A protein has these predicted regions:
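Secretory targeting and sorting signals
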Residues: 2-32
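Active-site catalytic motif of lipid deacylating hydrolases and related acyltransferases
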Residues: 38-99
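Gly/Ala-rich beta-loop-alpha elbow adjacent to hydrolase catalytic centers
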Residues: 104-109, 113
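Flexible "cap/lid" loop of the alpha/beta hydrolase fold
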Residues: 122-123, 127-169, 207-210
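Active-site nucleophile elbow and catalytic-triad environment of alpha/beta-hydrolase enzymes
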Residues: 198-219
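Short beta-strand/loop motif that positions the catalytic acidic residue
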Residues: 221, 227-229
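Conserved loop-alpha-helix segment in the C-terminal half of the alpha/beta-hydrolase fold
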Residues: 230-257, 263, 276
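Post-His helix in hydrolase/transferase enzymes
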Residues: 263-279
Length: 281
């Protein structure tokens, strides 16, 4: 897949006139135009990283809008295996992309992009959508429980179904959100119940260790960041998202949306991503 280019050519007319009297006649003015071009402005590739208990399809509405607007979009799988491993895999994927990148993370995806982008000169902007924006040593657990209001701050056995990983540590199982909790956590009443049921059915598990692994040095100290905050978020309370966004000096918008704002408010999310993309030019 090749990068899309937008070329802008500017013409500067340089008129060279010659006026000569020949008997009773007058010579006509002659004009010529020289073409001058500026370097092409390259739209960045937008990399959309999904969060826990989801897959790349959670970005479908946003991806379609970005593609309509001329952006190359990719939604690589997030392994949901732990911050370090997930960041390493994303970093390897980013290495295959030529040209500037806008890196977008939803929810747990924010943990991953913050670690994966560190030192990557191709990543020109970070965009956090209802996401964790960690500093060094932060964990998903510590950020989730920092302020009241998260559904996931409850006793784990009331929120998650636990499935042992064959050959793995029994204390670190895969976690699935209970169907009875899924809608309350992710969608509120903004998504029809039948659609919530489908999302819950196809959820991908998050490894328990992903909740407690510490983040490394954050990329947002050197890469400008943007954020979208859903004010009805029941996973990461809006107050916590605001605090993290301020700490990262992110360009922030707040919208009336649940945790899945890219599903319920794809237009607002797309606009914020494109604002970040335009700022990279």
């Amino acid at each position: 897949v090749k990068l899309l280019f937008r070329r802008r050519l500017f013409s500067v007319g340089v008129a060279i006139g010659a006026l000569t009297l020949v008997g009773a006649g007058i010579g006509t003015a002659q004009a010529s135009t020289a073409q001058h071009s500026r370097p092409a402005s390259v739209k960045p590739t937008v990399v959309l990283v999904h969060g826990a208990w989801a897959d790349g399809s959670s970005w479908d509405k946003v991806a379609a809008k970005l593609q309509h607007d001329g952006y190359r979009v990719v939604t690589p799988p997030n392994l949901l295996s732990g911050v370090d491993n997930d960041a390493a895999n994303l970093r390897a994927y980013l290495d295959t992309i030529t040209g500037p990148v806008v890196l977008v993370g939803h929810s747990y995806g924010g943990m991953v992009i913050t670690n994966a982008a560190l030192g990557d000169k191709q990543v020109k902007a970070l965009v956090y959508v209802d996401a964790y924006i960690p500093d060094q040593h932060d964990t998903v657990y510590s950020l989730t429980s920092a302020v009241p209001g998260s559904v996931f701050a409850a006793e784990a056995s009331t929120v998650f179904d636990q499935v042992a990983i064959p050959g793995g540590d029994p204390h670190y199982p895969n976690l699935y959100v209970k169907p009875s909790v899924f809608g309350k956590a992710f969608a509120d009443k903004s998504i029809p119940a039948k659609d919530v049921a489908v999302l819950a059915a196809r959820q991908r598990p998050l490894a328990y260790n992903a909740l407690v692994e510490e983040a490394g040095a954050p990329a947002w100290t050197t890469i400008p960041s943007w954020s979208v905050i859903g004010k009805q978020d029941a996973v990461i309370p809006a107050a916590q998202q605001i605090a993290m966004s301020k700490r990262a000096k992110a360009h922030t918008i707040e919208i009336n949306a649940p945790h899945l704002s890219m599903v319920t408010d794809a237009g607002a999310v797309t606009n914020q991503i494109e604002a970040a993309a335009k700022a990279t030019n």
